[in-house]
């Protein structure tokens, strides 16, 4: 049986083993999937040890995505653009030293938005909040959907400006700009995506009022039993639709499964089961 794992620190909270077990059962793929706690200074050793005992691939979570990027011997275009890796695929007998690094986070976000939520991004005005790793990982897949405009806003404006400039040249058909939260005053957006960690601190990004266009979607990469602080603030400010990041979690896992096994699982029943468990917790 082929072995896969998710590696991180901490890792006990991870839903990845449950998700991939459901995918394997649904598709009839014979595989095992486990969670591995790596020491903060022992990521590379942990990965290589897992590969040495027959591991075929790994998901990578906090805080090791940059180290995974450095460890990979080759990168997918979306991983190169993200500057971080959340999925590793190990080479077979002919290429034992090959480690492919991929980043499925942004693709998972886009699939959740466009397929699960029925929210097309083409021609829309998109606002991405944050300029860290989560935001960077989402940018290329978002831009590939050809929105009319994509604005990056961050507490430190210079980081948003720099991130926007790094992607603007490759996407001349999209109006890309970056700045601070206060620069959003008087502007309106069709899709607002929170890629900041503010919800972890039980806070919402300090956004000016009135940024949501009629029927706009507010999307938080974080998730919980109820509204996150960002979604609660969006509801109060008139967002037409609200969504959290549980679907993104399932869809990025499906992208990893597709990379490893060559088959895309049906995510709808897995997402519904996770949502029910979360509500009952």
From Swiss-Prot:
Shikimate binds at residues 14-16, 61, 86, 105, 223. Pathway: Metabolic intermediate biosynthesis; chorismate biosynthesis; chorismate from D-erythrose 4-phosphate and phosphoenolpyruvate: step 4/7. The keyword Translocase does not apply. Its EC number is 1.1.1.25. It comes from the Bacteria. Pfam families: SDH_C, Shikimate_DH, Shikimate_dh_N. Belongs to the shikimate dehydrogenase family. NCBIfam families: aroE, PRK00258.1-2. One of its GO terms (molecular function) is NADP binding. The gene is aroE. InterPro entries: Aminoacid_DH-like_N_sf (IPR046346), NAD(P)-bd_dom_sf (IPR036291), SDH_C (IPR041121), Shikimate_DH (IPR011342), Shikimate_DH-bd_N (IPR013708), Shikimate_DH_fam (IPR022893), Shikm_DH/Glu-tRNA_Rdtase (IPR006151). GO terms for biological process: amino acid biosynthetic process; aromatic amino acid family biosynthetic process; chorismate biosynthetic process; shikimate metabolic process. Keywords: Amino-acid biosynthesis, Aromatic amino acid biosynthesis, NADP, Oxidoreductase. Signal peptide: none annotated. It catalyses: shikimate + NADP(+) = 3-dehydroshikimate + NADPH + H(+). Homodimer. The keyword Oxidoreductase applies. The active site is at residue 65. This is Shikimate dehydrogenase (NADP(+)). GO terms for cellular component: cytosol. Involved in the biosynthesis of the chorismate, which leads to the biosynthesis of aromatic amino acids. Catalyzes the reversible NADPH linked reduction of 3-dehydroshikimate (DHSA) to yield shikimate (SA). NADP(+) binds at residues 130-134, 154-159, 221, 245.
